[in-house]
Each structure stands twice: as C-alpha cells, then as structure tokens.
From Swiss-Prot:
Entry similarity comment: Belongs to the chorismate synthase family.
Binding-site list for NADP(+): R46
Binding site for FMN: R123, S124, S125, N241, G242, G281, K296, P297, T298, P299, S300, R322
Organism: Helicobacter pylori (strain HPAG1)
Pathway as given in its UniProt record: Metabolic intermediate biosynthesis; chorismate biosynthesis; chorismate from D-erythrose 4-phosphate and phosphoenolpyruvate: step 7/7
Protein name: Chorismate synthase
Assembly mode: Homotetramer.
The entry's keywords: Amino-acid biosynthesis, Aromatic amino acid biosynthesis, FAD, Flavoprotein, FMN, Lyase, NADP
GO cellular component: cytosol
Details of cofactor binding: Reduced FMN (FMNH(2)).
Pfam family, one: Chorismate_synt
Catalytic activity reported: 5-O-(1-carboxyvinyl)-3-phosphoshikimate = chorismate + phosphate
Domain of life: Bacteria
Cofactor: FMNH2
Amino acid sequence: MNTLGCFLRLTTFGESHGDMIGGVLDGMPSGIKIDYALLENEMKRRQGGRNVFITPRKEDDKVEITSGVFEDFSTGTPIGFLIHNQRARSKDYDNIKNLFRPSHADFTYFHKYGIRDFRGGGRSSARESAIRVAAGAFAKMLLREIGIVCESGIIEIGGIEAKNYDFNHALKSEIFALDKEQEEAQKTAIQNAIKNHDSIGGVALIRARSVKRNQKLPIGLGQGLYAKLDAKIAEAMMGLNGVKAVEIGKGVESSLLKGSEYNDLMDQKGFLSNRSGGVLGGMSNGEEIIVRVHFKPTPSIFQPQQTIDINNHECECLLKGRHDPCIAIRGSVVCESLLSLVLADMVLLNLTSKIEYLKTIYNEN
C-alpha cells in the first residue's frame, strides 16, 4: 500500500531516480494558512549535502503545490504536490544492476514484483521520505492552529547515548544531537565508520507537546481498539526505511519494571510522571507524547560483501554512489513529520467521538 492515515490520508508515488516524486494529502480542512517558509525549512532540514555526516546527494527539494491551495489557503480538497529529482546518478548503480545488495530491499522487491529497478533502490529508496516531510509540514500547519508542536533529535549513535535532551540545540546541530556534551563523541563515531567504509546505527527521539509550556495536550486522541494512537505511531514509524524498533514512553524498559515502579501516579493537577509516554489505552492522556525510533546501520557500505545475483549465483558486491553513513540523522526529521501526520489525523478523527462536537459544528448557525 502507498497510503498512510485514516481521515487525513497521504498517498505517495515516485522512485529515487525517476523524474519526480509526489504526494496527495486528502482530508485537510479548508482555511488553513499555508506557511511556505515552514514548508521550505522542513525540506532543508531533511536535505542532503549539508555536511560530512550525511549523504552528499543534495536535491533542491522545491515543493510544487499542484492542487488544494487557493490564494495561500487550503481549500479542503486534496493537496497535490511534486518534488523533481534533479541530481540522480543512475550510472553509479550499473555494476550492481543484477545483484542483490545485502540488507537492502532489492531481494524482496524482485521476488514480489519480478522487476529489478536498480536505480538507487527505486520505490524502496529513502528518497521517497521527502514526500512525507512535505506532507508533515502541512500537518504541522494544522496542529499549530490547536496548539500542538512536534520536535525531534538524536539521542544515540553507535551506543553513545544522550544524557540530556535539548531540542533547541538539536535544531542547530549538524547531526541534530540532543545532548551537546555527547555530540562530539557521536560525530567521532560517525567519522570512524566513514573512514572504515562502514555505517552506523542510531536512535531518534520525537516528542509532541503543547505550544504553551504550562498547558497539556488534548486528551483522547486515538481510538480504544483498532486505531490506537500508539499503534498508529508505530505503524507510521515502522513504515520508514531502516527503522527496526519503536518505543513509546519507557518502551522496552517497561518489561523490566514492577507495576509499583512503572505506574504514573496522579494528583489533582495531573500525572506525577510520564512513563507511559503520553498514551493510555490507545489514547493521548494529555502528557507529552514521547517516541523513540531505532534505525539500523545504513546497508549501503563501501566494503566488498558476499551476495547473489538474480540468477542465484554467488558473487561479490562493491557499492558506489552517495549514501548516508547514519540514516538516523535525517531519519529523525522524517519521524517528526510522521508524528505530525498521525496526530493531525487523530485530531480530525476525534471530531466524531462525541455528539456534542457535531452539535457544536452543525448548530452554530
């Protein structure tokens, strides 16, 4: 499937080395002011070629809006948008056109569809994630209207873990590091991987909070059973290239605790802790939503590796091209966009949860 969302639905199309990639975002309400500066900034955050820690491939990533916007406001109809691919180098893949790159999707895509699109991974390339970032920018415009903001950064690279989380620092950091004190060690780990023609894994932290620090998030976003908020968040994150695990709140650590250690106690002002990561029973509880996303090392490394070709013959694979040494870095921006899309979707879906909401809409005139 190529569509994400229940009410606010994003459908994407295109390949890494095709003429363009694009998306259709259906379900956006009318009357939302389109913030072109925000859209451009989001695309630049994900953009390659900015420093030595990410891919050298630098696309312009100019978003061309083709529908759903009139005089700088959303019209309520599907928002269509395109991003042209201008700096693809398909010749870098000529030597592996009949090979399966280890730990890439080449093998599974070929056996499922019978087509070997070797040009940068085709549809399975992380290039497609640029569309998710563009769509996430539109979702952020919606969330801003009701006081919700999403933020992200890197908390771990190669086992070097952040001790403190500073989202303002992450915005200025070359690797979106949340901890200034650990940043240099994390950078060194990436540089060592590059020197060894290797790659390295990492963990991104994404959170949603109220724009106003003294206010809570809306309570009740998400459904109790088959559209749980945490399930939809995990689904969106796991649909991103290279993601191998998603944690909400304490996540895996929860399985090591007793109930007396894990439970979030309450007083008249609210919760006294947030080990649940802002989600209870599949719905937001008003606290910050905390998500950790674990990325595997980039499978594209510049070392000789054993593999097979499309005829099942054993051979050696030696890659060329331009690749991220740590996909978690730019991946953190995509995860932030995905959380924005999921929350915007749940906000719109929540309008049907009480008859009072519908009466407010339809009886106001």
